[in-house]
């Protein structure tokens, strides 16, 4: 052939080898490589007495032949459980290895078919094995019939010794020359203990070695430890020394020792013997995924499906833990958790398969394992506490920071893909530091700015509109930041880079814009947007605020014009000062600018022409600025924010008392302001307004949006029902509402809702589908299709006679709603309230209006009021007072025949549909962890009643019934309620905490009594003036008819003088009105009046008359006008009929006046209470009659259907009076009583104590009320409603207690609270609707009222703080635990007029309702857990987060 090579013959080219020759020729197919390999391996280090991982050089083939012998020895343990010893001797000097084990020996007998001894056959002949029967399930390492023969083949000497007592013989034979030669068999009699020994000398030449070096000996030694760990009950000796590894746990410790750092805590190992075939351990890994695993004593270095089986199960459960703790919102994937695990697995697998003879990777499918590894809940819990969760989250945070850094901007002359950006021509170029980016509040403001660019040019100025309020990035997580398009766009437009510091002006040159100018409305929400932008920059680039980088552009909020004179005012206090100093201010035309959109393009150009006046620089003034920004926006500074707001309210009150003007920022000479001044003088106004929107007034129980609705309804005084959509438009018009009408519609709907858990007294009547307890009001119809009208009770509560006494506000010259109305009972207790503002939140339960009236009568009579408990109209469950303002509430359960259960009431705030989906469905269908216990459940409820009839799977009824409190626990029908979070604004507009409902009642009583005195005085004056007027008119007519008085053909002055001479008075009614105005004006000077946001808010009459002196104004009236009430009468008045009518009217007024003078203010109040209670009885009686009438018709109709269907076919029934269509509870049912044990009370107190400590670590706790003695049951219950439209039905906090069946149904009761003397008796007049209460935490969303934004339609309302989340059913109590009321959750989304219970409003500007940053999902609540011997008590603890600044 070519190159002179001799051609090979056919015989030389195609050869046949024996199997022995093939093994020696191609060893890598059988034992792996025979070349030296460098790998990172675990080896045993004698000097350190532990496993070390290091790079060693070894021959895999040599290692494998040793391992085959060792695994054979370990396999013997599976054949003979009495085996307990393995002895391994490694002699590098003699190149000899020996493995000895006791236990059953190899049969020393002749094989009848092969005609040789069994040991000779299995060690000296290929393809022989005891593992060929696949029908036999074995958990040994041998499988293919090579094993020990391979060791024989690659050895120069291979000796087998075995002895068996069964055959009474011992065997010995030696092979040499790579199994090519065999010595004669030596057979001896034997009567000792069975054993087997293999001794071999590896053929080092085959492995290109000359001796057994240190690395291979270390690796072999490690395998000795492996076998000691993976072979239970076997002692392993190495070179005569017994190894100190007693079990798998000891073996793991040898590895962990190597990773412990003396300077830090030791690594926590979590170990578990899952079952007899699986033993698992795990710990955190900082080197990526690591595993040490064994299958039937075989070391699987590369892992395999047995490892995947364990790891996948572990990761799945750890991900659930991570989801709860992953506040960063990062999407953590399974492989990312895997990278933080170090797993140890020792398992026995039936007939395992591997990807090669080297057996490094187990490939058998999981279904063939013969067993499963199920990790216990304890193992998962311990793993979650081992540091693995923290490691994964820390890595996720680190990765998120790197990912966020990549999203930053860079300097470039042109950027694309950002809609609505008007980029400066020089942005990103050489003159970029001279460029200014104008950030506007919405598109309308952008139009204004673009108009201004016509004056200043577009080379150095760019404009970008914001879509609402920016995200509060200070506590934002990765997901929020990465998905927030607006923040990413800002970084790109400005060129900001995360993690970069901007310290000098040279650093500013790296940006696309050298300045940012904020241009927002001059209202409180505009201030909030400025603050959020400042916070955004301060959080990421605090050094940037120290440079002249940030500016604001201010515009007038009021303009006063007169002829050619135009005055601009940039704050309302400045405008008020000007009015006080300008006598002729009323001659000016006043125009209020509610937003930038009010200004015209011409005005925009005027603003930009006077840039020096309108541009204000933010100036850094040291650490006080940093501290102020952090205080305003950090979640950790809630208490500081409370102090900040309290100081602001005190300062406003003090300045009022001293007659000082309000402080304001923007004077005529203002060129710059500090960040601290902005926070303390401007942003504080938004925070205070946010509280006013979110927290009701103690006086009338209303929030501003609700008050605007009621003002409009009173003003319209409709006699016919009006469509809700039309009413909302009317509210916006009449009450100067400046935001979208959708939130008003929601407010109207919620004022009219009357299902269980909503209002105890609905002020508006629902005409149409306003929502039901089926879905908590979310099932209401569109505002276009439903109608409403004032309830007949409303004007009895908010009495028209009080209207003249109220202080009405003025907005843009328009008289709008008063600061507060003055109901005759405290409506804040009747209908309760919930809201989350800045620094504070409130939760006031509903109380029984009849109890409230009863207590008011007691107080009027000088007695102390009785303790009141929460009460919810038409709620049939029960509630018991425990201690410290906490109640335990339950639904109703009855046992029916046939071991069936009936649920006839749910906790307040638990809606029927949600309960079915979240509780009954899982109990019926089962979950991943728990099998279903219900075989069937049937529904018989309506929109107002609840009835589920439940059948159980075999044995489940008895099991649950035998458990104390079992039914209530399983069906999640018991929760707790706290009344320790009651905040409200008092009559002076100061935010206060009220420890109990009685404190609210007493505070209300003082004010209401004072105003009854004012009402009496007012009415006395009014009736006196009216009587005087009628008397003069009647006398005038008589004297005129009798010719005593002649007015014809006289001059006006002479005529008026004649009237005065004859004792006629100038118009008594006008004179009385003038006196009232003068008194109001004087009082306004002397007393501390309430503050107002937009215009003077003390009495409008007082303020206006203060500006125009009523005394002077009256004197200016001509005499004729003063006597117009006489001289202006028509000729018809001179008739006898009219004369008699006037006299009758006069006598009636005098009679009314006499009657009024005989009454005290207290008597007037009692009359009003009697009238209200009478009407309340009438209304509720009518409601009951209508409901019973409907139910009766329904029952009759369904009974007829049932009879008709029964004639034709057999109707399947669950028996025992639970017929189809029966909406009423079964009268034969046996009620299940819930028993509150001392243990439950102690657990509640302990859990509440921990929760309080977690919330307020530095604040002293409120004093606890004395313990309550248990009283006999039978009293009327009170319960708290959950009139939530968008509740999250949290069944994750349930009371575990005792329950037992009682022989009779018991009335709902409330346990006595300290101080109550007598049990309250149920009134016959309807006051005693059977009551109880359940509060599913977060389920009840009481009136959340805000005036600043528009809410999305009801269908899917985004939750601000508690967005819908997966319900956890594991805990014991669901209690807000809001002791001290210092939850302080500020919610930025809380700016809507939607007063639906716990339905947070969506934050957004009216004209940009579709924009804005995405809302953060309600953060999950922390849990305070008290560990006990029995169970854990868990209480949901409000996360003190300032949502107000966490958009």
UniProtKB/Swiss-Prot annotation:
One of its GO terms (biological process) is mitotic cell cycle. Its EC number is 5.6.2.2. The modification Phosphothreonine is found at residue 1352. Pfam families: DNA_gyraseB, DNA_topoisoIV, HATPase_c, Toprim, TOPRIM_C. It comes from the Eukaryota. Keywords: ATP-binding, Chromosome, Cytoplasm, DNA-binding, Isomerase, Magnesium, Metal-binding, Nucleotide-binding, Nucleus, Phosphoprotein, Topoisomerase. It catalyses: ATP-dependent breakage, passage and rejoining of double-stranded DNA. Its cofactor is Mg(2+); Mn(2+); Ca(2+). Disruption phenotype: Homozygous lethal. Embryogenesis appears normal, probably due to maternal contribution of the protein. However after hatching flies show a 2-3 day delay in development and most die before the third instar stage. Conditional RNAi-mediated knockdown in the female germline does not affect fertilization but embryos fail to initiate proper mitotic divisions and do not hatch. Embryos contain only two nuclei; a small nucleus with a centriolar spindle and a large round nucleus. PANTHER family: DNA TOPOISOMERASE 2 (PTHR10169:SF38), DNA TOPOISOMERASE/GYRASE (PTHR10169). Homodimer. Interacts with mod(mdg4). Interacts with barr. Interacts with ph-p. Interacts with mle; the interaction mediates association with the MSL dosage compensation complex. This is DNA topoisomerase 2. The lineage of its organism: Eukaryota, Metazoa, Ecdysozoa, Arthropoda, Hexapoda.
